[in-house]
A protein has these predicted regions:
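Core catalytic lobe of class I
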Residues: 2-154
Length: 154
C-alpha cells in the first residue's frame, strides 16, 4: 500500500466518458486508431482517421495547458493524415521518432508466394506541444506577440 497523492488513474472503458473528469494533463500518450483494422472500431485505411480522432483531439485541447506534451503513435500515413487536424486544434509539431521493430516483427506474417511489397516493420511516435495562445481583443496571440502587446500596453 502506498501513501500520498495518487500518481495515476486508470480508466477502463470508453475514454470519451472519462475526459470530463480529467485533470489538466502534463503528458498525453495516444495509441488509438491506426487505420489498419487493429481493433474493433479502428478504420480500415487512413480514410476516416480524422473523424475518429477529432473528438479526442478536441478534449485533449480543452483540458491541456500550454505545457502539455502529446505523444501520438501511429503509422506514417495515419499520422500524416491526422497532423493537419492536430495543428488546427492548437498542437505544434516538435519531432518524429521512428520505431524500427526489426525483422522478428514480420516472422510468420509474410508469405513468400504472395508478398508484393516490403513488410511494414516501423511505427512512428510524434511529439507535439500544446500551442501557447492568449486571447486579446478577440485575437489569438502567441507568447512573443502577447509579451510585445503587454509591453506596449504598459
Amino acid at each position: 500500500m502506498t501513501s500520498g497523492p495518487q500518481s495515476y488513474l486508470l480508466h477502463r472503458g470508453d475514454v470519451l466518458d472519462a475526459y470530463k473528469e480529467w485533470p489538466s494533463p502534463t503528458c498525453i500518450i495516444s495509441d488509438g486508431a491506426y487505420g489498419v483494422r487493429g481493433f474493433n472500431g479502428d478504420t480500415i485505411s487512413e480514410d476516416g482517421l480524422v473523424e475518429w480522432y477529432r473528438p479526442h483531439i478536441a478534449e485533449w485541447s480543452e483540458r491541456s495547458s500550454p505545457g502539455t506534451s502529446l505523444w501520438f503513435w501511429g503509422t506514417e500515413v495515419g499520422w500524416a493524415t491526422v497532423h493537419p487536424e492536430l495543428k488546427r486544434q492548437g498542437w505544434d509539431y516538435v519531432q518524429t521518432v521512428i520505431w524500427d521493430k526489426g525483422l522478428s516483427h514480420i516472422a510468420g506474417n509474410v508469405n513468400g508466394k504472395t508478398i508484393r511489397q516490403f513488410p511494414v516493420v516501423t511505427e512512428v511516435c510524434v511529439l507535439y506541444q500544446r500551442r501557447f495562445e492568449v486571447l486579446v481583443d478577440g485575437s489569438s496571440l502567441d507568447a512573443q506577440a502577447w509579451l510585445r502587446h503587454e509591453w506596449r500596453r504598459s
